[in-house]
Regions:
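Conserved PLP-enzyme active-site core in the AAT-like
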Residues: 1-94, 99
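Conserved C-terminal alpha-helix-loop-beta "cap" of PLP-dependent enzymes
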Residues: 97-188
Length: 190
């Protein structure tokens, strides 16, 4: 839910990478990514970089640089719009939970605050419903949101996320994974 703009990745990790396809370009018309490394791994990464031949095309670079010029303004507006939508959704009976770590009522707010300085417009809602078809109808009826997976572009999108199973994994080291009941559905919004 954040871009590298709001995180201090290299202050925490040796390698930080992110998609430049989403918020960086801002128009959903370019594909690329960024990689930032600290001095500890720089030589290894540069060796692989030279060996692999991976390069971004000039057109993709141009489109992403164009988007970077307005990134800060767009992210601030995404966040402001998201606050308005979340405040509206909090009052809806069918909404069980809003999954957005920047929200002070979020279970993960303290953890988010420790590592990030801002937020974007991507969040999910947990809808309580006896029928999946009702949730599909809800998503299809949205007038200001298109249907799709991408985010960070110029349009608002929504998609019903299919949750097959959610279980505790070893790598979580005791942290609680979200548990969903049969009558709960996730809709991702941007």
């Amino acid at each position: 839910n954040v871009t590298s703009t709001y995180s201090n990745g290299c202050g925490i990790f040796d390698i930080s990478f992110c998609s430049a396809t989403k918020y960086f370009s801002g128009h959903s018309d370019a594909m690329g990514g960024s990689l930032a490394v600290n001095q500890k791994v720089y030589k290894k990464i540069m060796f692989f970089y030279k060996l692999s031949g991976y390069r971004m095309s000039a057109d993709e670079a141009y489109l992403i640089i164009r988007g970077l010029r307005t990134l800060d303004t767009r992210l601030k507006q995404h966040y402001e719009n998201t606050k308005i939508i979340i405040n509206f959704l909090k009052k809806q009976k069918k909404i069980k939970e809003i999954l957005y770590p920047h929200n002070p009522s979020s279970k993960n707010y303290k953890l988010w605050k420790k590592y990030y300085s801002g937020a974007t417009g991507l969040f999910s809602i947990v809808i309580k419903s006896k029928k999946k078809s009702s949730v599909i109808s809800f998503v299809n009826s949205l007038e200001l949101f298109g249907i799709g997976y991408s985010w960070g572009g110029f349009e608002s999108l929504a998609i019903l996320q299919e949750i097959k199973s959610a279980k505790k994994d070893e790598y979580l080291k005791g942290r609680q994974f979200y548990r969903f009941n049969k009558d709960e559905f996730i809709v991702r919004l941007h």
